[in-house]
Amino acid sequence: MAVQQVKKSRSKRDIRRSHDSLTNPTLSTDKSTGELHLRHHVSPNGFYKGRKVVDTKSED
């Protein structure tokens, strides 16, 4: 196991951890259906930027 040679101060530890915080995912509203989806992702019904890009199975 690695063992530190010199103890890190609270300040140095906190500076290292400053980028570790989590943020909520950003959601967008689909233009055609008004459904929420992750930004830059295809919505569950196959639309992206208001256009149908993925063929989805119909419930027949």
Swiss-Prot record:
| GO BP of this protein | translation
Q: Known InterPro entries for this protein?
A: Ribosomal_bL32, Ribosomal_bL32_bact, Ribosomal_zn-bd
Q: Does the keyword Transport apply?
A: no
Gene name?
A: rpmF
Report keywords, A-Z: Ribonucleoprotein, Ribosomal protein
Q: Which family does it belong to?
A: Belongs to the bacterial ribosomal protein bL32 family.
GO cellular-component term (any): large ribosomal subunit
Which GO terms label this protein's molecular function in UniProt?
structural constituent of ribosome
List every stretch annotated Disordered: 1-60
- For bias type Polar residues, the affected ranges are 22-31
Specify residue ranges for compositional bias: Basic residues: 7-16
Carries keyword 4Fe-4S? no
**This protein is called what?**
Large ribosomal subunit protein bL32
